[in-house]
Design a protein with these regions (language model features):
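Positively charged N-terminal leader segments that act as targeting/secretion signals
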Residues: 1-10
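C-terminal accessory/tail domains of diverse enzymes
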Residues: 11-129, 142-251
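Short, conserved phosphate-binding/catalytic loop or strand-edge motifs used
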Residues: 131-135
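Histidine-centered divalent metal-coordination motifs
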Residues: 136-140
Length: 251
């Protein structure tokens, strides 16, 4: 039952129950927040998986790029929300705030993602709600129509209590992964918008300029459509962070 619900979430299609072919063709990306090691150490750990030397670009996010065998760029960046610790659990500098950002992935890349997670954990990476860390899954929005986007929101809203229980979402993280806004849901089902633009107007309560604000307050939803309107992919923010390869695969 859980797997069927997940399939419907990812494809936004009510007819996918029991059919996982759609999931296997869905493109996605993942952001994993962690600490216990520096960004440089995390980048080097990922580089060892690919036999690749990280490039340090710096900037406000202190970005590192690591190329894989398909010339895709994996990134390690700074995230200010993380509670930073060193490998001994003591308070640490901002160098220990680590966010791993994957390139666009496919189903066949999941074992590779698991290998990356194992490498970071072996390099002293730690994570979890106690460090204010989460995992964000970005799902390609290209297949979505206004109807399937409405379906996504309604399925999510109807099952989110179950999902929060199943995923054991920490109360410490609920500020950053709020449940579906009930006013938005009510207007969505009352007006039944026929276009993506009309749904966007409801999401931003008429303030269409909000789509250009990266840190829009609307982004802190477990089912984040700000990411869809701004970048073309919706975001699932309800997953507690983990560096356990099996947990990553289950997400």
């Amino acid at each position: 039952k859980t797997a069927c619900i997940a399939g419907r979430f990812f494809m936004g299609d009510e007819n996918l129950s029991g059919n996982f072919d759609g999931i296997k063709t869905q493109k996605f990306g993942v952001e994993i927040e962690c600490t216990g090691l520096t960004r440089n150490a995390a980048a080097r750990a990922i580089g060892r998986v690919f036999d690749s030397v990280p490039e340090h670009f710096g900037g406000s996010y202190d970005k590192y790029h690591i190329c894989d065998s398909k010339d895709r760029k994996w990134a390690v960046v700074y995230d200010s929300s993380i509670r930073r610790v060193d490998k001994n659990g003591g308070n640490a500098s901002r160098e220990y705030a680590v966010e791993i950002v994957t390139p666009v992935l496919e189903y066949s890349d999941i074992p590779l993602l698991q290998e990356i997670v194992r490498a970071v954990r072996s390099a002293d990476g730690v994570t979890g709600a106690q460090y204010n860390c989460g995992i964000h899954i970005h799902v390609d929005g290209a297949p979505y129509t206004a109807q399937s986007l409405r379906n996504l929101v309604n399925i999510f809203a109807s099952k989110e209590n179950f999902l929060f229980d199943m995923l054991q979402v920490s109360p410490m993280r609920e500020t950053y992964c709020q449940k579906v806004d009930r006013d938005f849901l009510e207007m969505l089902n009352k007006e039944k918008p026929k276009t993506i633009e009309a749904i966007q107007k409801l999401w931003y309560r008429g303030d269409m300029d909000e789509v250009h604000h990266h840190y829009s307050s609307t982004r802190y939803k477990a089912c984040n459509l700000h990411s869809f309107f701004a970048n073309g992919h919706w975001e699932m923010r309800a997953c507690n962070s983990s560096l356990h390869a099996g947990v990553i695969r289950s997400y």
